[in-house]
Regions:
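Surface-exposed binding patches on compact interaction domains or structured appendages
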Residues: 33, 37-75
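Short, hydrophobic beta-strand segments that form beta-sheet elements in well-ordered domains
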Residues: 34, 279, 304-309, 322-329
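Aromatic-lined carbohydrate-binding surfaces of glycoside hydrolases
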Residues: 79, 87-94, 100-299, 308-318, ...
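Catalytic-core region of carbohydrate-active enzymes that cleave or remodel glycosidic bonds
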Residues: 323-402, 406-407
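Catalytic domains of carbohydrate-active enzymes that cleave complex glycans
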Residues: 231-233, 245-249, 253, 257-277, ...
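Sec-dependent signal peptide recognition
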Residues: 1-8
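Beta-sheet-dominated interaction scaffolds and their linkers
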Residues: 14-33
């Protein structure tokens, strides 16, 4: 088994007496590995909660070519006392008094600074959700009461990490057959014998209300006007399903999307959601994006445009994009300069990782600190946050095996169907909170020398090609938690 490198960056461990020391701000939730089974954690303190558990082993495909499988301690089960790798999560309320507190062998220091609630974080987190995967693993009818009940703890856990956008679908299979479970449309469309379109938004509305009640938002990312096969399904006059190819620039595209966008914009205005709604495209060609952006601006100017792009930003020059996420593999100094210009214009800019790069990433086989660096590094580059395509797009038996086809294991999910987070997700959340703290200190004009030191530690080419990510993580937490 691969054992996770012990995460005690923000801490020092006095192994002689097994005392463990961690520091955090008020309002922060910090997860870390316990250094030894002899590190007893017990006791209470006002405003501080400590939960412990075990990282249970999960199988994954480690080498596609050799079909070599391994196991890794990744599924974080709170309350478990099973043998193996143990961890703890410390939560300090915003009303907690600063100072040091002892919980058995664990010493927690609350720093006299406060992290606001996740809803107020400036950090822009966009992990794509997959409702139909939840329905399948729980044996539920999609969007039934039991389905919503199964989704709720997973969606609330994501909201607690600062998730800013709800993933919704305007067409069937926007990513074709990429996932184990198909995405379906949350909008029903019909075309009568006279060629008139009508739309039913009942499921869309219900799901948006649910997502916001879980704390996700305020943005709504609508996939997509450019599905991978350009197919739009609709119900014909006789009630049968018709598959129409509607490629940007064709009469079919213009006819359907014109009527839909006009009606959709009207509906969003009535619901009060228009200013929060984005038409989202994933890794589409500049030609398609240019046509769609101009089309949307003409027909439904109240809607925004969101793009994840795997080409140089210059390839999209002249295209009006409100929220842009750039492939981390293609990051360079020119993009960083362009992103700063976008920030000054009030536009959202993030980066994403997916099946690439090999590192840093959030795969089952990723090294210590990689997930943390993925989520923290954007603020060093003056970006707004981080995007990843799959929060919960599970394979066949994710509680036991995170393999999906021959993709890099872990690429498709950061949580488990029973609501357990992965260790990768907890490290990602640690990085997000440190990023928010970095931004708070920067906006206050505080600790400038320390923040400059952190910036100098991150060299783009080193981060892209491989470095000591655990050391970077450790130094970030040490500096940001100074008293």
């Amino acid at each position: 088994m691969i054992w996770r490198t012990i995460l005690f960056a923000f801490a020092t461990a006095a192994y002689a007496d097994y005392d463990c020391h961690v520091s955090l701000w008020r309002g922060e939730s910090l997860s870390f590995l316990l250094p030894d089974e002899a590190c007893e954690v017990s006791g209470e303190a006002p405003g501080i909660e400590v939960q412990t558990g075990t990282l249970l082993p999960v199988r994954y495909l480690a080498d596609n070519a050799a079909l070599e499988y391994k196991t890794v301690a990744d599924r974080a089960v709170y309350g478990s006392r099973a043998p193996g790798v143990h961890f703890a999560t410390v939560m300090a309320s915003r009303g907690a008094d600063s100072g040091s507190y002892r919980f058995g062998n664990l010493v927690v220091t609350v720093v006299d600074r406060t992290l606001p609630p996740p809803k107020e974080w400036k950090y822009y987190l966009d992990l794509w959700q997959h409702p139909w995967a939840v329905a399948r693993v729980n044996g539920c009818e999609p969007f039934s009461p039991s389905h919503y009940k199964a989704m709720e703890p997973l969606w609330r856990q994501l909201a607690d990490a600062g998730q800013k956008t709800l993933t919704v679908t305007l067409v069937d299979r926007p990513w074709n057959k990429q996932c184990r479970d198909a995405y379906h449309s949350m909008v029903v469309r019909r075309k009568d014998a006279m060629g008139k379109w009508s739309f039913d938004y009942s499921r869309f509305d219900e799901y948006v209300v649910f997502g916001r009640a879980c704390g996700i938002g305020p943005h709504i990312s609508c996939y997509t006007m450019c599905p991978w096969e350009y197919v739009v399904d609709y119900e014909g006059p006789d009630g049968t399903t018709v598959k129409m190819v509607a490629k940007p620039g064709t009469a079919e595209f213009d006819d359907y999307w014109h009527d839909f966008l006009e009606d959709f914009e009207r509906h969003l205005k009535e619901k009060g959601w228009l200013s929060d709604t984005y038409v989202a495209m994933d890794e589409r060609s500049p030609e398609d994006l240019d046509y769609i952006a101009k089309f949307v601006r003409h027909v439904a100017p109240g809607l925004k445009i969101s793009v994840a792009g795997n080409r140089p930003l210059s390839a999209f020059a002249g295209i009006d994009i409100d929220s842009y996420s750039h492939s981390f593999r293609r990051m360079d100094d020119q993009f960083i300069r362009d992103a700063l210009l976008r920030k000054r214009q009030g536009l959202i800019t993030t980066y994403y990782v997916c099946c690439e790069p090999p590192r840093p990433n959030t795969f089952m086989g990723s090294g210590a600190g990689e997930a943390f660096v993925c989520s923290f590094y954007p603020v060093v580059l003056n970006l707004d946050g981080f995007l990843r395509w799959a929060y919960n797009s599970w394979g066949e038996d994710p509680l036991r095996d995170m393999t999906y086809r021959r993709w890099a294991s872990g690429d498709t999910a950061l949580v488990y169907p029973d609501g357990s987070p992965s260790w990768r997700f907890l490290e990602l959340k640690n990085g997000i909170q440190q990023a928010e703290k970095f931004c708070i200190l920067h906006d206050m004009g505080a600790r400038k020398d320390d923040l400059d030191e952190l910036r100098r530690m991150f060299v783009l080419r080193d981060v892209q090609t491989g470095t000591d990510y655990a050391r970077l993580r450790d130094k970030v937490i040490e500096i940001l938690n100074k008293r």
